[in-house]
Amino acid sequence: MALASGPARRVLARPWGLGLEGCGVPRRGAYEWGVRSTRKPEPPPLDRVYEIPGLEPITFAGKMHFMPGLARPVFPPWDPGWTHPKFRRLPPLQEHPLYKDEVCYIFHQRCRLLEGVKQALWLTKTKLIEGLPEKVLSLADNPRNHIENQDERVLNVISHARLWHSTEDIPKRETYCPVIVDSLIQLCKSQILKHPSLARRICAQKNMLSTTWKRESTLIQVHGSSGAQLNAKDPLPPIASREEVEATKNHVLETFSPISPTISLQECHIYDVNDDTGFREGYPYPCPHTLYLLESANLRAHRFQPDQLRAKMILFAFGNALAQARLLYGNDPKVLEQPVVVQSVGTDGRVFQFLVLQLNTTDLASEEGIKNLVWVDSDQLLYQHFWCLPVIKKKVVVEPVGPTGFQPETFRKFLALYLHGAV
């Protein structure tokens, strides 16, 4: 009989026999299998120079390299003579040249007003009128202002943006939304031969607006870029008559107590109160005509609700009108002899919002007196849905590729706003 080795004898001597739950593998501790501890090793002690009063430490600073037995020298922080932007330390806010003790509530392009249009009307001291003005609707209904093969060309614009422009099977909203608006503007420009005064306009992109006003005791500012902006050499004519403007004195603005009217606005102590239209002095197209605001976020959570988009349109149109009025009539709050009119179009590529704002007064501090006017036409569908891929059931094409539920009246209003002031 062969003699068993030492480990084998120890295993056989155990009452439970072979290990690993009786499978013949001996049990060992965790460290016997080579498993290391997950505890991090202690950091090495810091090399420091112990200062003893009356004694000077001997370091290897003069040697210019490490020497065992000598203390590690302590050098002062290195000053390269310039500051890297990554490591620049900003001064305290109170030392900023534009710092002010009075807080300013700023509305920028990503602000979402909690109360929507109702809050925007209070901030701008404006009276809301549903629907577009009769003057604009008459331009939309007049067949002389229509484009040749208008409906067919608009359908081609929609198909170009949703189907032909992108190589993706289903283009994203951020891709097709700007293409639709740009193509519709180009389609409106084709009327220059019929209306030569349309050549006195230009479309600018990403201009920065900044204007500030007092609303009661609150300082409010609109700051940022609204997207594409149509500017003209000549201002838009007033919409409401003098009698209609005087009648706004009796209008009472709706409040939303106990909610603060400045909710959703950004509080800031660093701001500039000077007005800036986004264009230099002497710009040949100084008058704002129409703002085109796009809501092209792909994720639904990042999109503006329709009411929030209309509120954004009101504030940016009001900011452009106020900056233009102060440029023409000065900074003193007063009732304007010639009201300033600014239009706005907002869309997500499918649903359009139309707006016309008339600035009647720059006296915005009190609730009394003349109010501004805004006409809003909400939720106008250009088309119901667009099938990027055909729907096939039982080898039969149920839904072909293309738009469904096309509504030509929406583009007529779009065209009427573009032609307003030139016809």
Swiss-Prot record:
It is found in: Mitochondrion. Residues 1-29 form a transit peptide. It comes from the Eukaryota. The keyword Membrane does not apply. One of its GO terms (biological process) is translation. Keywords: Mitochondrion, Ribonucleoprotein, Ribosomal protein, Transit peptide. Pfam families: PDCD9. One of its GO terms (cellular component) is mitochondrial inner membrane. Belongs to the mitochondrion-specific ribosomal protein mL37 family. This is Large ribosomal subunit protein mL37. It comes from Bos taurus.
